[in-house]
């Protein structure tokens, strides 16, 4: 177990306040017709180095999480980000977010949604740019 139970109360949900609420949002977005093996959500884990977390002020930490969530919403659309949970009970704080991989034409396609290596590299660069002001 990596989580420190004493710090679990410091965790919080900024999108969907419960698993049931998040699943309800997923169901609302899903197309009626879909493959049985379709990926329903893609998880993003967003964090910084342990050293940064030790030096960052509470304000910088809050801004990191806000900017991370904003990056996801700008890239994929606010409606597709169905859950975002800040975990502060582990050695390195992080945001765990779930995004429904809908294509522009309303299909579920994680492959098309995520893209290939070059698109993933581009995503890493644009994300890095979004948190650069925080010294990252």
Where do the language-model regions lie?
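N-terminal nicking endonuclease/strand-transfer module with a His-rich metal-binding environment
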Residues: 1-136
């Amino acid at each position: 177990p990596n989580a420190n139970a004493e710090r679990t109360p410091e965790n919080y949900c900024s999108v969907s306040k419960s698993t049931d609420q998040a699943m309800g949002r997923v169901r609302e977005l899903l197309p009626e017709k879909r493959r049985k093996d379709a990926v329903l959500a893609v998880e993003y884990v967003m964090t910084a180095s342990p050293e940064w977390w030790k030096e960052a002020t509470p304000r910088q930490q809050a801004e990191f999480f806000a900017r991370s969530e904003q990056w996801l919403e700008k890239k994929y659309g606010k409606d597709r980000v169905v859950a975002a949970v800040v975990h502060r009970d582990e050695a390195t704080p992080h945001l765990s977010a779930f995004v429904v991989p809908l294509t522009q034409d309303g299909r579920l396609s994680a492959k098309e949604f995520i893209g290939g290596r070059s698109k993933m590299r581009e995503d890493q660069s644009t994300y890095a740019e979004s948190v650069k002001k925080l010294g990252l």
